[in-house]
Amino acid sequence: MSSGLILLIVAIVLLVIIAYLVGVIIRKRNDTLITSLEERKQALFGLPVNDEIEEVKSLHLIGQSQTSFREWNQKWVDLTLNTFTDIEKHIFEAEHLNDTFNFIRAKHEINSVESQLNLVEEDITAIREALGILKEQEEKNSARVTHALDLYEKLQASVAENEDNFGSTMAEIEKQMKNIEAEFSQFVALNSSGDPVEAAEVLDKAEEHTIALGQITEQIPAIVAKLEDDFPDQLDDLETGYRRLLEENYHFPEKNIEARFQEIRESIRANSSELVTLDLDRARDENTHIQERIDSLYELFEREIAAYKVVAKNSKILPRYLAHAKHNNEQLKHEIARLSRKYILSENEGLNIKAFDKDLKDIEDNVLEIAEAFDQQEKPFSELQLILDRSIKTLASVESGQMDVFAAVKDIEKIESQARQHLEIYVTQLHMIKRYMEKRNLPGIPQDFLSTFFTTSSQLEALMDELSRGRINIEAVSRLSEVATAAIANLEELTYQVVQHATLTEQLLQYSNRYRSFEAGVQNSFEHALKLFEVDNDYQASFDEISYALETVEPGVTERFVNSYEKTRERIRF
């Protein structure tokens, strides 16, 4: 056998071995793919779709929801009965082809199964999502229905428990509840007939009406309590109190109180009748108006009761106060009469006393009897209170005026005594000032000083004349005494000024001798100042003249002399 043939045989054997090995590898790989597809199929088939379908089926869907459920359920049935069976057949065919080394057809079957599984997976996902949506929607709808029914049941229970608190509105409330029941029945009918949209609208209305009626029933008892309990009780209390006050001789500014009671009762009945319309805002407004009218009656009675207490108190005060004021007036009249014999008084005191008499007589004639028998009067106590209050204020004003008059007259004698004492002092001071001036040995007395001196003397004489009269005008005495006091003080100050200017002028004239021989200005001022001093007796002008001249040659000299004089100045010894 030739070597070439041997090589050919060896090559063929090698090719066969390689082909076998390749076939084994491909077969093994396909087995793995087929096993994976089988596991994937089992996993999809094992999903709890049946349980989810049964769960949704138990919800007893109706209408469009039930139709949708049937479609998805049928799709699942088709998958389980047809698609999965077809996939199983293709998997079996792929296994057979792979075992017989028909790899191309086996690969085709594997790809086909994989595509089918992808579609099945998408379908199952869609089915489960649809079932979830149906379940969620149904649960929501069920919750809404349950919530609405719960609200209605609570409303029923509340109305039943508080039936006695709704008064005349009970019939209308029952009517409204029947309407709500009819809406629930309509909802059930529409939902069962497959019209979920309209059914939902009806359910919304039923729920809204339930909530609205619930809110109304919560507010009605308070309104009814006012109309059936509070207002009647208050009116009974008012009428009882009114009768008792009449028995106690109370009178009122209003004469139609009984009619007001009747009008309020009619308003209560009318509001109770109108309440059946469930117009709560109007009912509350009317209740507020009724309460205001009741409160106004309470205020009227309370005002008269309070006025009675004040009148009872003031009726005891006024007679004593009046007697006190009359006594004060008599004392004032006696005191003024006594003082009038010696003094000329101001007309105001007499006029005031007359005005006091008039006020006191008016109270005595018109009010005293009312105060002493106030509980027998046929006037409201509030009016009596005003009368007594005004009278007590008048008495207080009279008393204050009496105190003012007393203060004005009580010091008259003291004023006279002080004026006489001051006059004696002032006359003495006038003589001392005269002696003080005489001791100065002045060349002459300035005319303005003489004028002031004689004016002061005249004012003292006027005060002396007034105090010497048979009846003293005390106002004139007070005025003249004040004038005399000011005049003496002014004369004393002027005396010091005249003496100071005269003394300082003499000193400065002597001091100027050291400058006269060589200062022509000083010499001229000296001559002028000397004339003013000795001839004109104008000591102020003489001082100004010489001091000005010396200041030009020796600044500060005048101040030095003035300071020295003030330290040694002799005072007038009064």
From Swiss-Prot:
Tree of life domain: Bacteria
Annotated TM spans: 8-26
Alphabetical keyword list: Cell cycle, Cell division, Cell membrane, Coiled coil, Membrane, Septation, Transmembrane, Transmembrane helix
Bilayer topology: Single-pass membrane protein
Main location: membrane
Compartment(s): Cell membrane
Topological region Cytoplasmic: 27-574
Extracellular side: 1-7
InterPro entries, alphabetized: EzrA
Coiled-coil portions: 102-131, 161-190, 276-379, 459-493
Residues of the signal peptide: none
Keyword Coiled coil included in the entry's annotation: yes
GO cellular component annotations of the record: plasma membrane; septin ring
GO biological process: division septum assembly; septin ring assembly
Pfam family, one: EzrA
Described function: Negative regulator of FtsZ ring formation; modulates the frequency and position of FtsZ ring formation. Inhibits FtsZ ring formation at polar sites. Interacts either with FtsZ or with one of its binding partners to promote depolymerization.
Family designation: Belongs to the EzrA family.
UniProt protein name: Septation ring formation regulator EzrA
